[in-house]
Curated annotation (Swiss-Prot):
The encoding gene: M2
Entry's Gene Ontology cellular component terms: plasma membrane
Residue span of region Disordered: 504-563
Family: Belongs to the major facilitator superfamily. TCR/Tet family.
Species per Swiss-Prot/TrEMBL record: Phoma sp. (strain ATCC 20986 / MF5453)
Disulfide bonds: none
PANTHER family to which the protein is assigned, alphabetical: MAJOR FACILITATOR SUPERFAMILY, MAJOR FACILITATOR SUPERFAMILY (MFS) PROFILE DOMAIN-CONTAINING PROTEIN-RELATED
MF terms in GO: transmembrane transporter activity
Function of the molecule: MFS-type transporter; part of the gene cluster that mediates the biosynthesis of squalestatin S1 (SQS1, also known as zaragozic acid A), a heavily oxidized fungal polyketide that offers potent cholesterol lowering activity by targeting squalene synthase (SS).
Pfam families in the record: MFS_1
Full protein name: MFS-type transporter M2
Length: 563
């Protein structure tokens, strides 16, 4: 194998900050994610208007699909690239590209240009989300990570809520739909300036040319081909082509071949693999990645199909169907903050994950009983249960993976986690759509079988016609929820694989000979601000501190003993 010692090939970027400066960094990350989520959730509101303006009624879904595919592709790459080129430089660069892409969306005069710009938005936006978690990993001790990362959650939810409202307001103005992108572009630019000023930075020790030589180019190429082929095949199933079409089979074949090549390259040739295969040799991490995939499946399937259930089967208004998602979103924030606080105080992450998965399983099983006559209160309660499950398990799974890996691998394991989450979301929506359509094709009366081609084709039907097709839709939606329940069962099985060792016992640290290795994070039982109180003024700067000095500043008990 061509692998080198990762810890020696990469420069140290961990830089714990004093509490006031740490809070400023976390708030900056939250502000950036607020802007990103306005864009992500505002687009769907504008799709009908954009389709009419650009004459793209048949292909407008690619505005979202191109972004999702690019996000998934680049979510794999950013972790290792940030190890090589530095977190801050890559983060600010991604924000700059995001701003340019948003501007391009606003000036798009054809569907192809719009889709290309949305892909660029996804490539940069996915990296921003990834790097936000990785930067938080660098500046917050492992034990307190959940607590501070939960501070970011309200910003993301606020962006989710404001996105559709801002989009609707701008669309009615003289700026039309283009105004949303013209608004977000300067906000992204300002966010880049803010991040460049506030975020800590540890400059790479090697030259740019030397860093370029470290990049796993073959691994990046083969992973991109594998992911794009798979995502295009899955995203288009039932919409642009049937799952058994020659196009789908060809895409999946190319994707499979590229995936095998990627595994071989990462195993035999890559000096700094973008995904070290060694992380999959850790059963705990593999199980957590599987749980992340299934969690993404269940969550995204609900976000996509609950409105379809509400509008097509229950004949509720679009406003009501949108409000139904609020319990899932709102409770996730509250529970995520509670879970983060609990992990910091208890020193354990397993309890919150187990409770979250249990709630997810119970909620998903109860959801299979949704039908035409289900009481609205039952629907809301079940969605609250699912939201509690997602909120309690989502972020703690990140902390759990980081606790089971070396420090040098935490950036790539974070990227891998986000990749599996995006992949699970995409597969959840695509497979659920295929289940919905296949069930409708099999059960709809002959005169209405064409309705299986589009979940939004019911708008022009009379109440009498809706009553005729309602049993078929009820059966199809139930099958979708049964598939989500199956994913939840699979997620629960992962609980029997990994164990909670806390934050203090990690024998696989990069430097086993370092006397302070085990002390650095066990001493975090004191608040992080206490760790900083003993630092000299120069030690709290954003610059690099010598390794020996840094160890001293992170071990206050040793300082008290006169180290």
């Amino acid at each position: 194998m061509a692998h080198t010692n990762t810890s020696t090939a990469l420069h140290e970027q961990e830089n714990f900050l004093p509490k006031n400066r740490l809070l400023l960094v976390i708030l900056t990350l939250g502000t950036v994610l607020f802007v990103i989520n306005i864009d992500h959730n505002g687009l769907s509101t504008l799709l009908p208007t954009i389709a009419e303006d650009l004459g793209a009624q048949k292909s407008i879904t690619w505005a979202g699909s191109s972004q999702l595919i690019a996000t998934t592709v680049f979510s794999v790459l950013y972790g290792r690239l940030s190890d090589i080129f530095g977190r801050k430089a890559l983060f600010v660069s991604a924000l700059g590209v995001f701003s340019i892409a948003e501007l391009g969306c606003g000036f798009a005069n054809s569907p192809r240009m719009l889709y290309a710009m949305r892909a660029l938005t996804g490539a940069s936006g996915g990296g921003i989300g990834n790097l936000s978690i990785i930067i938080a990993t660098d500046v917050v001790s492992l034990r307190h990570r959940g607590q501070y990362m939960a501070v970011v959650a309200p910003f993301m939810v606020l962006g989710n809520v404001c996105g559709p409202l801002v989009a609707a307001g701008v669309a009615k103005s003289s700026l039309t739909w283009r105004g949303l992108f013209w608004l977000i572009s300067p906000l992204g630019g300002l966010s880049a300036i803010l991040a460049g000023y506030i975020l800590p930075s540890t400059a790479p020790t090697d030259t740019f040319k030397q860093n370029l030589a470290k990049v796993d180019w073959l691994g990046s190429l083969t992973s991109t081909v594998a992911i794009v082929g798979f995502m295009v095949a899955v995203s288009g199933t039932g919409t642009y082509h049937p799952g058994y079409s020659p196009l789908a089979i060809s895409l999946l074949s190319v994707s499979g071949a590229a995936f095998l090549a990627f595994l071989f390259i990462e195993w035999k040739f890559a000096t700094l693999p973008i995904i070290p295969l060694t992380i999959f040799a850790i059963p705990d991490v593999s199980a957590l990645l599987m749980q992340t995939f299934t969690l993404g499946w269940v969550n995204q399937a609900n976000v996509y199909f609950i409105p379809i259930y509400a509008q097509n089967l229950r004949q509720w208004s679009p406003v009501i169907s949108g409000v139904l998602l609020f319990p899932i979103i709102a409770v996730q924030v509250i529970v995520s903050m509670i879970a983060g606080r609990w992990m910091s105080k208890s020193g354990q992450y397993g309890t919150t994950i187990r409770l979250g998965v249990a709630f997810l399983l119970i909620g998903s099983l109860l959801e299979t009983q949704f039908g035409r006559s289900t009481h609205p209160a039952y629907v809301v309660i079940v969605l609250l249960v699912i939201g509690i499950g997602v909120g309690a398990a989502n972020q703690p799974m990140v902390i759990a993976m980081q606790a089971h890996t070396k420090k040098s691998e935490r950036a790539v394991v974070t990227s891998s986690r986000n990749f599996f989450r995006f992949l699970g979301s995409a597969c959840g929506v695509a497979m659920s759509a295929a289940i919905l359509q296949s069930t409708l094709r099999a059960s709809l009366p002959v005169a209405y079988k064409h309705l299986a081609e589009s979940p939004y084709a019911l708008a022009g039907l009379s109440p009498q016609e809706r009553d005729v097709i309602a049993p078929s839709y009820e059966r199809a939606i139930r099958h979708v929820f049964i598939a989500s329940a199956g994913a939840s069962v699979l997620c629960s099985l992962g609980l029997f694989v990994w164990k909670d060792d806390g934050y203090e016992s990690r024998p696989n640290e990069d430097n086993d000979n370092d006397q302070h290795a085990s002390t650095r994070e066990t001493d975090e039982e004191d608040e992080q601000s206490t760790l900083i109180d003993n630092r000299e003024p120069s030690a709290v700067s954003y610059g690099t501190v010598e390794a020996g000095e840094r160890d001293r500043y992170k071990a206050p008990d040793r300082l008290r003993r006169g180290l």
